[in-house]
Amino acid sequence: FGYFCMSLIMTSSPLHMHLIKKFSLFETSIAIQLHVVGMFLPSLISGDLVKRFGSTKIIYVGVTIGFFSIFVNTMFDHYYTYVIGLISLGIMWNLLFISGSSLLVISYEEKDKFTAQGLNDFIVFSTQGIGALSAGFLLYYSNWTIINLICIPFLLMVIFVSFLSSNNKSI
C-alpha cells in the first residue's frame, strides 16, 4: 500500500502544482526530482536499518513519515512544503518497500518462493498502477487534500498488518 500512496500522490503532485497552484514547470520538475532523490538515496542505509532494528520497526517509521508527508501536504500551501512533502513521501516509500521486501523473503517456504514473489509483484504493481492511473481523475473530481487523505486508511492497514505479523511469526 506504500507504493499505492506514493504513486497516487507523486503522480498528482505535478498536475496540482503546475495547473492548479501555478508553479512553473521548472519548480515542479525540481520538486519531483527531489522526490526521486528521497525515494532512492535512503537505500544506502535502509537495508542496514532493517538489519539493525527489524522490518516491523522500520515499517512503523516509514508509515510515520508517510503521515508526516500527508500532514505537510494538506496543512501548508507553499512551494517548499510541497518539496518537503514529496521528499518525505519518497523516504516513506523507500522504507516500506525495503522493509516489506525483507519480510517477504522470510514469510514463505522455499517451495513457494516463486509463487509468493509473483503474487507479491502482482499486488504491488497493480496497486501502484491503480494509484498512478487514478491520480488525474481523482484530482479533477476532488482536490489535493482528498488525494492525500485517501492514503490514511491504507497506511493504517500497513500498521495493522505489521502489528499482526509481529505478534504472529507464522504470517
Regions found by a protein language model. Give the residues of each.
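A late C-terminal transmembrane helix in Major Facilitator Superfamily
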Residues: 112-141
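A membrane-interface helix-boundary motif in multi-pass transporters
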Residues: 137-155
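Paired small-residue
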Residues: 69, 80-88
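Intracellular juxtamembrane helix-capping segments at the cytosolic ends
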Residues: 95-108
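Short amphipathic helix-loop junctions that connect adjacent transmembrane helices
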Residues: 11-31
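Helix-to-loop junctions at the C-terminal end of transmembrane segments
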Residues: 41-55, 139
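Conserved extracellular-gate-facing transmembrane-helix segments in secondary transporters
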Residues: 1-10
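Structural signature of the two symmetry-related core transmembrane helices
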Residues: 57-71, 152
